[in-house]
Amino acid sequence: MTFSPEPAYQHGHAPRTAILLVNLGTPDAPTPKAVGRYLKEFLSDPRVVEIPRAAWLPLLHGVILPLRSRASALKYESIWLREAHMTGSPLLVYSERQAHALQRLMNQHGHEVTVACAMRYGNPSIASVLEALRRQGCEQVLVLPMYPQYSGTTTATAFDEVFRVLGQWRNQPELRLVKHFHDHPAYISALHQQVGAYWARHGMPDFARGDKLILSFHGVPRRTLELGDPYHCECLKTGRLLGEALGLQPGQYQVTFQSRFGKAEWLQPYTAPTLAELGKVGAGRVDVFCPGFPADCIETLEEIAMEGQTEFKVAGGKDFHFIPCLNDADPWVAAMAEIALQHLQGWPLATPHPHELEARRTRAQTRGAAA
């Protein structure tokens, strides 16, 4: 195996610490070609689709990609941002805003770290961002996936890709991984404040008359739970902690699972049928919040805010409220900083004094170092 060449080592160089935020990914454009390229990478991951490759890949390339690329492109087109200050895929826009906000907050607290974001599928790729961090002299990297609840289909595959990339390096950085933060007090507090702020602006549901808060998480095949994936349990715990923080009784909120793909049984109850059933029984108001998505994306903006609202109202529901995700809200940025700092303990968060760096370089040169 040939390992990649390294930048020339500089004595007296101040090693930097980096925080790498990783999210799922997005197509480069809302076009069938770009969406097809993204879906091919995403659905080819054996962590995502646990079907024997010999059976799955012909189906993926021969049926699924030709059919889904155009349909999905229309959905991306419906949510694509085209404002002067926000242009592109919502997931990428909000992910970059999160990284910039976290960078500002760390700087304000005197922590000299580099914050970057990458996507597991699509761009900016984990490989390209890790390479950029290497060239900036980052020798410690904290990988913080934007998946509060751990799953082999999300968190693990992000770690897999980091390991794959670093496996090609000759001089690897020191690495730390954040597995999950589904019950972290700062995360729960940020969720609580996000819902509370929305209710302060738009009024609270009338729970006494039967209004309901739906907490919709991304679904995964039920088989993953049976094989030991903790995702289902962590979603339920997040939902319970958020419900308690909001002062709600168990019947006033419900955890559901969305984005089912294929015919296999997934985690239940499913979000769409739940919304339709609430509409049928005449629910006056339903609020939907997606705690497992720290940034708004196609699953929240199109599947919930558009399709979910239609499901509810066509079935007879009246008042539908979609509560935006955390995005770059201040409480969430502060929570990210708190989570990161807990995992950064013991790593350098400040640059040594220039005199100390020069002394290191001089000592190395007296021993024959070239630079």
From Swiss-Prot:
It is found in: Cytoplasm. SUPFAM superfamilies: Chelatase. One of its GO terms (molecular function) is metal ion binding. The gene is hemH. InterPro entries: Ferrochelatase, Ferrochelatase_AS, Ferrochelatase_C, Ferrochelatase_N. Pathway: Porphyrin-containing compound metabolism; protoheme biosynthesis; protoheme from protoporphyrin-IX: step 1/1. The keyword DNA-binding does not apply. PANTHER family: FERROCHELATASE, FERROCHELATASE, MITOCHONDRIAL. One of its GO terms (cellular component) is cytoplasm. Keywords: Cytoplasm, Heme biosynthesis, Iron, Lyase, Metal-binding, Porphyrin biosynthesis. It catalyses: heme b + 2 H(+) = protoporphyrin IX + Fe(2+). The keyword Cytoplasm applies. Fe cation binds at H218, E299. Belongs to the ferrochelatase family. This is Ferrochelatase. One of its GO terms (biological process) is heme biosynthetic process. Its main location: cytoplasm. It is an enzyme of class 4 (lyase). Catalyzes the ferrous insertion into protoporphyrin IX. Its EC number is 4.98.1.1.
